[in-house]
Amino acid sequence: MNYAYKRWGFGLVALLLSALTATAAVKVHTIGDSTMANYDENSTDKRGWCQMLQQFFNADEVVINNRGKSGASSKSFYLESAYWKTVIANVNEGDYVLIQFAHNDEKNGGLDGDDVIAHAKENGQSTDGIDYRGTTASGTFKKYIRAYIEETKAKGGKPVIVTPICRKYFSGNTIRRNGMHDLGDSFSILGSSSKGSVPESDNTYDYAQALRDV
């Protein structure tokens, strides 16, 4: 009889645990720049798109942890202690991490800020006006994006690369990708160094293009 109770008890615990697992809220961490960040609704009409994201979900099912930072580049968000380190520390297995950078990586004409600073110092030149946030589109930008991907996966998280918010550079009826770091629909080139494919999205380009066509 005791064995029957034990079997029944274990079965009940398993059932309860499965119910908790089924109803646990999905957590989505979002990292990026000003187009994603939170803003004070009492002082400005500016809004980051991830600031508005929670309203599309039941908070019991999906929780948005928006960590977008105005002025952040892929490099500065990774290196400055208040940002990526505090995000990745709270990423758990099954969490999603939305990654969106590019606009602030285009400093110094597409040159890496640290390289430009080092070159200036070597030649006795002023470093005033050189922005360390800058990355090279084919080098350090990809390096930091890959770091976000690989560190997220190492924690059991699911990285999602989001292309930067589309800028209104129209040439006739077509939007030109002026941004040097705007990889468009080609983020798959990161795959070879990212241990598998990573989902990508370019909906803001498609949306803006559709409005222009109207």
Question: What residue spans do the PLM features occupy?
Answer:
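Short, solvent-exposed loop/turn segments at secondary-structure boundaries
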Residues: 40-44, 76-79, 173-174, 199
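Alpha-helical cap/lid subdomain in secreted, periplasmic
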Residues: 6, 85-214
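Charged, often glycine-rich, active-site loop that binds/positions anionic groups
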Residues: 73-87
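Bacterial N-terminal signal peptides that target proteins for export
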Residues: 1-12
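Bacterial N-terminal signal peptides
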Residues: 11-19
